[in-house]
Amino acid sequence: MNKLVKLGLAAAGLWAWLGMALAAPEVATETRPIDARVVRVKLDGAVDLRIRQGSTATLILSGDPRWLAKTITVQSGDTLNIDTDIHGRVHLGALHAELTLPALREVSSESVGSTEVSGFSGEELELSLDGAGSMRISCNYKLVSASLGGVGSMHLQSLSGEGVDLNLHGAGFVTLNGRAKWLKADLGGLGSLDAREFAADSVNIELSGLGNASVTAHQNANLNLSGMGSVTVYGKPLNRKVAVDGLGKVSWK
């Protein structure tokens, strides 16, 4: 009797394994044509995108062949648009794009997937994220302008430049890591800013929403609070200017 039970369990396990193997999605790879003029990337749909610096411009897509066929990539001058014409449910992580570019000036995403950017440097980088996706940036630019809407997340790390100009108007969160001469942040939504690990000489915060912010300022801190959120300032700046017209508060650490 025990042998029959064991054989039954083994057979059931084998059929389950075969079912999983047969159900495993097919993965295909495509190389799409682009050239080195591309310095701006606009992303939409359900694509995980990785952008890295390299001497030759290339774009490689991978994923289910049915979804690859509905992934649209169009270059218009210096701008590359990536979108998916997919209706219905798509599992996150099922579509991947590997993009290599010599230079980069702008990344704009309305995707629900993740976007990673690394290895670039230059004068100015413009970032925009709307929706429920995520963006992780590890680059070295003199000036970084970043805008976050929706419920997504943005992580800017290894920063080392003149300044960062941040606009947070959604319910997501932003983390900054590195240093710069100045940080300017306009926080008007429900989201939060964690810049404790971002050392700035001067910090200028306009907070009109419900979110909270943590920043590090070593010389100047100019804070204007008109919402319900609060600001925590590290670094013991010598020059402090605070205006509070709401329920928020300022803490010095």
Name these PLM-found stretches.
Residues 1-253:
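Intrinsically disordered, low-complexity terminal regions
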